[in-house]
Amino acid sequence: MSASIARATVRAVSRRKILSTRAALTLTPSAVNKVKQLLDNKPEYIGLKVGVRTRGCNGLTYTLDYTKNKEQSDEEVLQDGVRVFIEKKAQLTLLGTEMDFVETKLSSEFVFNNPNIKGTCGCGESFNI
């Protein structure tokens, strides 16, 4: 069972730096720190799970939840001591994506910088591939 934790925004990026990793998803230091902070007082959870749902004006949106277990079909990303699990349905949509955590005066949110996105809605919450 999982519990929803945060909103997520997507951004289409034209190019992505080539990183020496085989993971479908990489995390920025800001994202790693936020994930550690979120899990600090929650020993019952082993990490975060990224999923994708049909929703919004552009078709798809990412979900981000706490998770207590790894499903057999989940892909695990282990980076800098944090574990992020990717649901099977989201794996192809996340290839080459960078997960960041951005704080401004008005909001704080995880941002998925995804080179595979063909279009996003005006608010950035939904996308199509």
Swiss-Prot record:
Entry keywords, A to Z: Iron, Iron-sulfur, Metal-binding, Mitochondrion, Transit peptide
Entry keyword Iron: yes
Any Pfam family matching the protein: Fe-S_biosyn
Gene Ontology MF term list: 2 iron, 2 sulfur cluster binding; metal ion binding
Transit peptide start and end: 1-12
Keyword Iron assigned: yes
A Gene Ontology term for the protein's cellular component: mitochondrion
GO BP terms, alphabetized: heme biosynthetic process; iron-sulfur cluster assembly
Binding, Fe cation: C57, C121, C123
Coiled coil spans: none
Subcellular location: Mitochondrion
Domain of life: Eukaryota
NCBIfam families: iron-sulfur cluster assembly accessory protein
Family under the similarity heading: Belongs to the HesB/IscA family.
Job description of the protein: Involved in the maturation of mitochondrial 4Fe-4S proteins functioning late in the iron-sulfur cluster assembly pathway. Probably involved in the binding of an intermediate of Fe/S cluster assembly.
Protein name as catalogued: Iron-sulfur cluster assembly 1 homolog, mitochondrial
